[in-house]
Amino acid sequence: MTRFSTLLWCSLFASFASHAKLKVFVLAGQSNMQGAGQVEMKENSRNGGQGTLAYLVKNEKTAKKYAHLVNKKGEWITRQDVWIRYDDRQDGLRPGFGYRNTSIGPELGFGSVVGDALEEPVLLIKTCW
């Protein structure tokens, strides 16, 4: 059923892209591909959230490097030129496509770089075990 829904979703995406070429990348791997990087964490937990993506976006030493992930209000950006399909989730690329919807994996960095480098729309199909 998952394969069928992936195929169906790809077909629907292709119809939206109409005459444009679509670049498809399959991200396959084991647990590291799933992604356990935390997007956000309560400030009173562990080390005050240091090491989370939210911390990196707000920290003055790293904010510039991660500024492309948030808008002026500090809200996560959902890319409209890079789409991702993972497990039962699909959407424009944004934080939340890791092992859980509160985590990230390599798809976020990869998709950001590839989306910036290519003019065509991008589809990431992530599969891991």
Label every model-predicted segment.
Residues 19-129:
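Cell-envelope and extracellular/periplasmic
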Residues 1, 18-19:
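Short, surface-exposed loop and linker segments with low hydrophobicity and enrichment for Pro/Ser/Thr
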Residues 2-9:
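Sec-dependent signal peptide recognition
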